[in-house]
């Protein structure tokens, strides 16, 4: 798992696992490819720079945003049960925000499990700030070692699948922690299955057992979803429009004028999918450089991000397509949010068939 250490003052080791240090070049290509596609899209990765992470955290504290409260309730009531599936002397890799990780790490400490925890983030400042806050929250740790990884999901797949012998943790098991409904933020559940499969195959290549702890939104109440993701909510709008500012930074030019754009959202219960769009208020021409100009008509939707609202049945299909089985689900009392334990098909657990536990408010 080759990586280059990045010096910084957070008190945790941070390694650069990016395959290409100039990640902006990949984003530039993704922007132009998306504007050429039908329908037009922009890469959701634009939303998750350091400022985007800050703005999303502000949005997540909105009264109507039900996911955060439900996830915290499950973590409060069930974290000690959830971490029982994480073996001692193993690796825990978090794909996403560190905002709610502390409860699980404290549960691992209480169970006295030596575990190496890696946090993956595409933003160096976002990663180091989160690690600093996590260390402040947790204080001295005796069993869990915390390390940061700078890179994308694809970089993490490559890091897992190409061990260099430099990593001091000799472990047969890697548990991937994916909270905040991030699994459903890809374009389609097939893409989510594909990414899960890539991680499983990377572990296979390194002779590691692979399992996932995934938190996913199962809410099917259209009114609740539409209220939570109302694009006129100022905090959500600020988060989304920051993605256009980030696009300008990536392109090295003011291709997007945020004042020319509004935001819209639509929930499609039959697909269990929420879509969020950028919509120009007038006809715009986007000069992205290299003599390339893209035209977007007034009212034409450009997809910013997708968010699946997947019930247990669909989540089971996602897992199965990726070569995983569902071992356990921990849910809130309304059945709108779940933590799932998925494991590779050749592994066995004493719990037997899939079980569901409910967390109460």
Swiss-Prot record:
GO terms for biological process: methylation. Pathway: Secondary metabolite biosynthesis. Transmembrane segments: none annotated. The keyword S-adenosyl-L-methionine applies. InterPro entries: EgtD_Methyltrsf_superfamily, MeTrfase_dom, MeTrfase_EgtD-like, SAM-dependent_MTases_sf, SAM_MeTrfase_EasF-type_put. Keywords: Methyltransferase, S-adenosyl-L-methionine, Transferase. Disruption phenotype: Leads to a tenfold decrease in the amount of benzomalvins A and D, but not their complete abolishment. One of its GO terms (molecular function) is methyltransferase activity. It is an enzyme of class 2 (transferase). Its EC number is 2.1.1.-. N-methyltransferase; part of the gene cluster that mediates the biosynthesis of benzomalvin A and D. The pathway begins with the loading of amino acid precursors onto the A domains of the non ribosomal peptide synthetases benY and benZ. BenY and the A1 domain of benZ are loaded with anthranilate (Anth), while the A2 domain of benZ is loaded with phenylalanine (Phe). N-methylation of Phe by the methyltransferase benX may happen before loading of Phe onto benZ, after loading of Phe, or after dipeptide formation. NCBIfam families: methyl_EasF (TIGR03439). Belongs to the methyltransferase superfamily. This is N-methyltransferase benX. The lineage of its organism: Eukaryota, Fungi, Dikarya, Ascomycota, Pezizomycotina.
